[in-house]
Amino acid sequence: MYICKRKTKNDMKRILSLAFAIVLLATLPMQGQGKRYQVAGVAFYNLENLFDTIPNNPLGRDAEYTPNGARKWTGKRYWNKIHNLAYAISNMKTDLTPMGPAIIGVSEVENITVMQDLARDEQLKAWNLQVIHHDSPDRRGIDVGFLFNPRLFRPLNVTHHTLVVESNPNFRTRDQSCVSGLLLGEPVSVIVNHWPSRLGGQKQSSYLREAAAALSKHIADSVLAINPKQKIIIMGDLNDDPMDPSCAEVLGAKRNVKDVEEGGWYNPWWDVLASGVGTLAYRGQWNLFDQIIINYNLVGKDRSTLKYFKCKVHNDIPGIRTEEGDRTGYPLRTFASGVYLNGYSDHFPTQIFLTRELK
């Protein structure tokens, strides 16, 4: 929701001054080359069951996240969760992006209210994050969402897309949200996802994630049909790794930039996982489900427009890891085995950095 008011002459002067300061903040010297670049961070974070305390799911699927429910989800626990997540997000700023990520896609949020509460936390208040949210048909009552810094990204169009699986017509999952706008003034589209889980087995449920990947590709193709030069990002908790069929075959996201052809996709997380780094772990096995995949228009050596620079798993935020026991090094969750841990999420956040040379 946007609230607009008439701008005075002094307001416009302040806005222009702020815009100039933002350009300075978003630039850095490339060591040894004498060049300066603007940098934009684009991030994703699975917030793991960010429910409020009010029972409002028609099917009662949020009952455990109420004060009298199984999780004893009191106001105190809710606000602890908000504060912890805001702390993690505030630590996603880097030397390259002192204002934090321009865009943060999220998953497992119950409604727009929890996103607004997160954006208003004191640790994020200075960023003035704005919220885009859509209630989807997922039976658990969780959705994807979109946070953005309005000084760095301006949304122009938002669409939401429901996954329909012909062989399983009663299946319901999270809708995919496509947000198109201007990132540092350049047209960019971001498709935020939370693909179906591996419930029932990885292989047995793979067809659902492959269908979700096909929907993401269809959305992207529709955008490219209007503007073949559009920069597109597919992000989310994909519940698959980079080498799984949904990503590697249906999307066709490549491990090596040199293999990405026009109209194709690059997946920088393939090598990250191969190095032993993931975003979530189960029984000693790391996975990298939280991926940010980019299209052909975001790769290449031409730095006159925004291009991919590097990626990062934010597993080094102080306090975000489990420090003891058989889950040492894992993301510190809110609950584990039914025990309240006052943690963050069962996933680490991820981020890519896009750069553009300043002339």
Residue ranges of model-derived segments:
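Bacterial Sec-dependent N-terminal signal peptides
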Residues: 1-37
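N-terminal, active-site-proximal structural segment of metallo-dependent hydrolase catalytic domains
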Residues: 32-124, 132-144, 320-328, 342, ...
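Metal-dependent phosphoester-hydrolase catalytic domains
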Residues: 33-34, 222-232, 240-359
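Structural recognition of the beta-strand scaffold that forms the well-ordered cores
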Residues: 41-44, 102-107, 130-133, 145-148, ...
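Catalytic metal-binding/acid-base residues of hydrolase active sites
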Residues: 48, 110, 196, 238-241, ...
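Second-shell loop/turn segments in exported
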Residues: 68-78, 100-106, 133-134, 165-167, ...
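Structured beta-strand-rich core segments of catalytic domains in phosphoester-bond hydrolases
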Residues: 109-195
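Extracytoplasmic, non-cytosolic globular domains
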Residues: 133, 177-272
